[in-house]
């Protein structure tokens, strides 16, 4: 669960980084020489993260972006190819589909804090192309302190998890998207949260009716967000 305790959690994050490697997260190393404070401090520290091997082939760390006091936080899986190259979350094809869905339900993207459960692009090469590969549990676990730090600093009223990876990072490994999609849950600190499909999953449904049906699921859940938590 999530418990808001900014100072303690940031300190614990660095205490754990300084420990010897554990079986759960190999190659754990300090993210930065001093404990980060605030979103910008976390962002800078994350650029030095070596907790898992994903940093090495990736172009850069892709940290979250958006207002530091955003009312709504969207959490995705990991950066894609476009995000890895640009350094900005949700700017590739999935991000463009998300933008379309947000516009349709009347949500201004610029009011949201957008981030991912994993901060580096995991991929495999096929010729000159870099093909997305889902992150493993070790990658999600290695990045979880960064996500928790973002949540604790932004303190959103609502968290929307896009896809199963984001949901497992926020709710825990036992959470299943099939069973809980679109249903509100309260985190330990009182933050309301729910999970919906990832726009990248919508794109993978091909063309025609299958994709439209998948897109309607995303729209339906975002509309629920608007209905249950209207902008002030």
List where the protein language model places each region.
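A polyanion-binding, active-site-adjacent surface
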Residues: 1-232
